[in-house]
Amino acid sequence: MISCWLCARKAGSLAVLVAIGLSTTLYSGLAQSETCALPSEHEGMTFPIEKVDPDWACRLYAIVDNYTTVGKVGPIRTGLPESLYHQLLDRPPLAAALINRLELGLYKSEARGSGRFWGNDGEGTAGIVQLVYQDRNSRIYYLEGSHDGRFLPHITGKAVVFLRMNPVKDTDGMEAMDSTMVSYARLDNRILSGVVTLLRPFIGGTIKRKLGKGVETVNRLSLLMRQQPDRVLFEVMNPPAFPDDEVAFVKQALERLSHSSDLIPSRTPSP
Protein backbone atom coordinates (compact mmCIF):
# COMPACT_ATOMS: atom_id res chain seq x y z
CA MET A 1 0.00 0.00 0.00
CA ILE A 2 3.32 0.36 0.02
CA SER A 3 0.82 0.14 -2.57
CA CYS A 4 -0.65 1.72 -3.98
CA TRP A 5 0.57 2.16 -1.50
CA LEU A 6 3.23 0.49 -1.81
CA CYS A 7 0.58 0.57 -4.04
CA ALA A 8 -0.52 3.23 -2.53
CA ARG A 9 0.91 0.96 -0.61
CA LYS A 10 1.39 1.43 -0.18
CA ALA A 11 0.62 1.01 -2.26
CA GLY A 12 1.49 2.42 -2.25
CA SER A 13 2.04 0.92 -2.69
CA LEU A 14 4.08 1.87 -2.05
CA ALA A 15 5.53 5.22 -5.82
CA VAL A 16 9.24 5.67 -5.89
CA LEU A 17 11.86 6.47 -8.60
CA VAL A 18 13.00 3.25 -10.20
CA ALA A 19 13.86 1.43 -13.47
CA ILE A 20 15.19 -1.24 -15.83
CA GLY A 21 17.95 -3.01 -13.92
CA LEU A 22 21.13 -4.86 -14.73
CA SER A 23 20.86 -8.15 -16.60
CA THR A 24 20.27 -11.43 -14.79
CA THR A 25 23.62 -12.65 -16.01
CA LEU A 26 25.48 -9.82 -14.34
CA TYR A 27 23.61 -10.28 -11.08
CA SER A 28 24.24 -14.03 -11.10
CA GLY A 29 27.93 -13.26 -11.38
CA LEU A 30 27.74 -10.90 -8.45
CA ALA A 31 26.12 -13.63 -6.38
CA GLN A 32 29.35 -15.57 -6.47
CA SER A 33 31.43 -12.65 -5.22
CA GLU A 34 32.49 -12.33 -1.61
CA THR A 35 31.99 -8.57 -1.93
CA CYS A 36 28.23 -9.10 -2.22
CA ALA A 37 27.46 -8.61 1.47
CA LEU A 38 24.11 -6.86 1.84
CA PRO A 39 24.06 -5.17 5.27
CA SER A 40 21.35 -6.22 7.69
CA GLU A 41 21.04 -2.89 9.53
CA HIS A 42 19.37 0.09 7.89
CA GLU A 43 18.69 3.34 9.76
CA GLY A 44 18.72 1.56 13.11
CA MET A 45 16.48 -1.33 11.99
CA THR A 46 17.77 -4.88 11.54
CA PHE A 47 16.44 -7.13 8.77
CA PRO A 48 16.99 -10.92 8.36
CA ILE A 49 19.18 -10.63 5.27
CA GLU A 50 20.43 -14.19 5.79
CA LYS A 51 16.97 -15.40 4.77
CA VAL A 52 17.01 -13.53 1.44
CA ASP A 53 17.81 -15.58 -1.65
CA PRO A 54 21.55 -15.05 -2.45
CA ASP A 55 20.87 -13.95 -6.03
CA TRP A 56 18.38 -11.36 -4.82
CA ALA A 57 20.72 -10.24 -2.06
CA CYS A 58 23.30 -9.35 -4.71
CA ARG A 59 20.80 -7.50 -6.86
CA LEU A 60 19.84 -5.43 -3.84
CA TYR A 61 23.46 -4.96 -2.80
CA ALA A 62 24.31 -3.40 -6.17
CA ILE A 63 21.84 -0.61 -5.33
CA VAL A 64 22.46 -0.26 -1.60
CA ASP A 65 26.23 -0.12 -2.11
CA ASN A 66 26.04 2.47 -4.89
CA TYR A 67 22.89 4.47 -4.20
CA THR A 68 22.06 7.93 -5.48
CA THR A 69 19.95 8.76 -2.45
CA VAL A 70 18.83 7.07 0.76
CA GLY A 71 16.01 8.14 3.04
CA LYS A 72 13.84 7.09 5.95
CA VAL A 73 10.08 7.61 6.15
CA GLY A 74 8.00 7.06 9.26
CA PRO A 75 6.83 5.69 11.43
CA ILE A 76 3.46 6.44 9.83
CA ARG A 77 0.32 5.03 11.46
CA THR A 78 -2.41 3.22 9.55
CA GLY A 79 -5.72 2.45 11.26
CA LEU A 80 -5.94 -1.22 10.31
CA PRO A 81 -5.52 -4.41 12.35
CA GLU A 82 -2.31 -6.30 11.61
CA SER A 83 -3.86 -9.16 9.62
CA LEU A 84 -5.97 -6.85 7.44
CA TYR A 85 -3.00 -4.55 6.85
CA HIS A 86 -0.96 -7.51 5.59
CA GLN A 87 -3.83 -8.69 3.40
CA LEU A 88 -4.08 -5.30 1.71
CA LEU A 89 -0.31 -5.25 1.20
CA ASP A 90 -0.73 -8.54 -0.65
CA ARG A 91 -3.42 -7.01 -2.90
CA PRO A 92 -2.04 -3.81 -4.50
CA PRO A 93 -4.55 -3.90 -7.42
CA LEU A 94 -7.49 -4.06 -4.99
CA ALA A 95 -6.08 -1.32 -2.76
CA ALA A 96 -5.43 0.91 -5.78
CA ALA A 97 -8.94 0.30 -7.14
CA LEU A 98 -10.52 1.19 -3.78
CA ILE A 99 -8.46 4.38 -3.56
CA ASN A 100 -9.59 5.36 -7.06
CA ARG A 101 -13.27 4.60 -6.48
CA LEU A 102 -13.25 6.57 -3.24
CA GLU A 103 -11.42 9.47 -4.93
CA LEU A 104 -8.47 9.31 -2.57
CA GLY A 105 -5.89 9.14 -5.34
CA LEU A 106 -5.13 8.12 -8.90
CA TYR A 107 -3.22 4.92 -8.20
CA LYS A 108 -3.33 1.99 -10.61
CA SER A 109 -1.87 -1.47 -10.14
CA GLU A 110 -1.81 -4.81 -11.96
CA ALA A 111 -0.46 -8.21 -10.92
CA ARG A 112 2.48 -9.36 -13.05
CA GLY A 113 3.30 -12.69 -11.42
CA SER A 114 3.89 -14.02 -7.92
CA GLY A 115 4.69 -11.10 -5.62
CA ARG A 116 5.24 -8.87 -8.64
CA PHE A 117 3.10 -5.85 -9.50
CA TRP A 118 3.03 -2.95 -11.92
CA GLY A 119 2.01 0.36 -10.40
CA ASN A 120 1.35 3.97 -11.40
CA ASP A 121 0.70 6.74 -8.88
CA GLY A 122 -1.01 9.03 -11.41
CA GLU A 123 1.60 11.71 -10.78
CA GLY A 124 4.39 10.70 -13.13
CA THR A 125 5.86 7.68 -11.36
CA ALA A 126 5.37 4.17 -12.72
CA GLY A 127 7.20 0.88 -12.51
CA ILE A 128 7.44 -2.69 -11.27
CA VAL A 129 7.46 -3.69 -7.60
CA GLN A 130 8.83 -7.11 -6.66
CA LEU A 131 8.40 -8.56 -3.18
CA VAL A 132 11.76 -10.12 -2.28
CA TYR A 133 11.22 -11.12 1.35
CA GLN A 134 8.45 -11.03 3.93
CA ASP A 135 7.72 -12.08 7.48
CA ARG A 136 5.30 -10.80 10.11
CA ASN A 137 7.25 -7.60 10.81
CA SER A 138 9.41 -7.01 7.74
CA ARG A 139 9.22 -6.79 3.99
CA ILE A 140 11.89 -6.07 1.41
CA TYR A 141 10.97 -4.79 -2.06
CA TYR A 142 12.91 -4.32 -5.28
CA LEU A 143 11.60 -1.67 -7.65
CA GLU A 144 12.37 -0.55 -11.17
CA GLY A 145 10.66 2.17 -13.15
CA SER A 146 10.62 5.80 -14.21
CA HIS A 147 9.47 9.28 -13.22
CA ASP A 148 8.40 12.33 -15.22
CA GLY A 149 7.89 15.57 -13.36
CA ARG A 150 7.72 19.33 -13.79
CA PHE A 151 11.13 19.91 -12.28
CA LEU A 152 12.86 16.66 -13.18
CA PRO A 153 13.39 15.33 -16.72
CA HIS A 154 12.45 11.76 -17.58
CA ILE A 155 14.56 9.65 -15.26
CA THR A 156 14.85 5.93 -14.72
CA GLY A 157 16.36 3.98 -11.90
CA LYS A 158 15.98 1.17 -9.45
CA ALA A 159 15.34 1.06 -5.73
CA VAL A 160 15.28 -1.12 -2.64
CA VAL A 161 12.72 -0.50 0.09
CA PHE A 162 13.03 -2.01 3.55
CA LEU A 163 9.68 -1.95 5.36
CA ARG A 164 9.26 -2.50 9.09
CA MET A 165 5.74 -2.97 10.50
CA ASN A 166 4.71 -2.89 14.15
CA PRO A 167 1.20 -3.52 15.53
CA VAL A 168 0.11 -0.83 18.00
CA LYS A 169 -2.99 0.61 19.66
CA ASP A 170 -4.05 4.14 18.79
CA THR A 171 -5.21 6.76 21.28
CA ASP A 172 -8.73 5.30 21.18
CA GLY A 173 -7.51 1.78 21.87
CA MET A 174 -8.05 0.65 18.28
CA GLU A 175 -5.68 -1.75 16.56
CA ALA A 176 -3.33 0.00 14.14
CA MET A 177 0.00 -0.45 12.37
CA ASP A 178 3.11 1.72 12.40
CA SER A 179 5.15 1.52 9.19
CA THR A 180 8.73 2.69 8.75
CA MET A 181 10.53 2.54 5.41
CA VAL A 182 14.14 2.94 4.37
CA SER A 183 14.64 3.41 0.64
CA TYR A 184 17.80 3.29 -1.45
CA ALA A 185 17.44 4.60 -5.01
CA ARG A 186 19.96 4.64 -7.84
CA LEU A 187 19.53 6.57 -11.08
CA ASP A 188 20.28 5.00 -14.45
CA ASN A 189 20.67 8.33 -16.25
CA ARG A 190 24.38 8.99 -16.68
CA ILE A 191 23.99 12.74 -17.14
CA LEU A 192 21.92 13.08 -13.98
CA SER A 193 24.30 10.84 -12.06
CA GLY A 194 27.09 13.25 -13.00
CA VAL A 195 25.37 16.11 -11.18
CA VAL A 196 24.04 13.96 -8.37
CA THR A 197 25.42 16.27 -5.68
CA LEU A 198 23.09 19.02 -6.86
CA LEU A 199 20.11 16.73 -7.46
CA ARG A 200 20.35 14.50 -4.40
CA PRO A 201 18.31 16.72 -2.00
CA PHE A 202 15.52 17.20 -4.55
CA ILE A 203 15.40 13.54 -5.61
CA GLY A 204 15.54 12.36 -2.01
CA GLY A 205 12.70 14.68 -1.06
CA THR A 206 10.60 13.46 -3.99
CA ILE A 207 11.06 9.82 -3.00
CA LYS A 208 10.20 10.47 0.64
CA ARG A 209 7.05 12.35 -0.37
CA LYS A 210 6.00 9.52 -2.68
CA LEU A 211 6.47 6.85 -0.03
CA GLY A 212 4.88 8.91 2.71
CA LYS A 213 1.89 9.84 0.58
CA GLY A 214 1.30 6.19 -0.31
CA VAL A 215 1.08 5.11 3.33
CA GLU A 216 -0.97 8.16 4.31
CA THR A 217 -3.43 7.41 1.50
CA VAL A 218 -3.88 3.88 2.81
CA ASN A 219 -4.54 5.38 6.24
CA ARG A 220 -7.24 7.61 4.74
CA LEU A 221 -8.71 4.48 3.16
CA SER A 222 -8.72 2.72 6.53
CA LEU A 223 -10.58 5.66 8.11
CA LEU A 224 -13.27 5.52 5.43
CA MET A 225 -13.61 1.76 5.90
CA ARG A 226 -14.24 2.33 9.61
CA GLN A 227 -16.37 5.45 9.40
CA GLN A 228 -18.26 5.01 6.11
CA PRO A 229 -18.51 1.25 5.45
CA ASP A 230 -21.74 1.64 3.45
CA ARG A 231 -20.07 4.07 1.06
CA VAL A 232 -17.08 1.76 0.61
CA LEU A 233 -19.31 -1.23 -0.11
CA PHE A 234 -21.42 0.82 -2.52
CA GLU A 235 -18.35 1.80 -4.53
CA VAL A 236 -17.14 -1.80 -4.62
CA MET A 237 -20.47 -3.07 -5.97
CA ASN A 238 -21.29 -0.08 -8.16
CA PRO A 239 -20.94 -0.99 -11.88
CA PRO A 240 -18.48 -1.97 -13.03
CA ALA A 241 -18.45 -4.07 -9.86
CA PHE A 242 -15.27 -5.53 -8.46
CA PRO A 243 -14.68 -9.27 -9.02
CA ASP A 244 -16.68 -11.52 -6.70
CA ASP A 245 -13.67 -12.57 -4.64
CA GLU A 246 -12.68 -8.95 -4.04
CA VAL A 247 -16.24 -8.00 -3.07
CA ALA A 248 -16.26 -10.88 -0.58
CA PHE A 249 -12.91 -9.76 0.85
CA VAL A 250 -14.06 -6.15 1.28
CA LYS A 251 -17.31 -7.25 2.94
CA GLN A 252 -15.39 -9.41 5.40
CA ALA A 253 -12.89 -6.61 6.08
CA LEU A 254 -15.67 -4.10 6.77
CA GLU A 255 -17.39 -6.51 9.13
CA ARG A 256 -14.15 -7.08 11.03
CA LEU A 257 -13.50 -3.36 11.35
CA SER A 258 -17.06 -2.74 12.51
CA HIS A 259 -16.79 -5.51 15.10
CA SER A 260 -13.44 -4.24 16.42
CA SER A 261 -14.89 -0.72 16.71
CA ASP A 262 -17.84 -2.04 18.72
CA LEU A 263 -15.46 -3.64 21.23
CA ILE A 264 -13.93 -0.27 22.14
CA PRO A 265 -15.97 1.46 24.88
CA SER A 266 -17.04 4.97 23.99
CA ARG A 267 -15.34 7.75 25.88
CA THR A 268 -17.42 10.06 28.02
CA PRO A 269 -16.11 13.46 29.01
CA SER A 270 -15.22 13.96 32.65
CA PRO A 271 -17.71 16.13 34.59
Stretch-by-stretch model annotation:
Residues 34-53, 162-271:
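Terminal "cap-and-tail" regions of soluble proteins that handle hydrophobic small molecules
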Residues 95-118, 238-254:
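Short solvent-exposed beta->alpha transition segments
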Residues 108-160:
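Glycine-rich portal/gate segments that line the openings of hydrophobic small-molecule binding cavities
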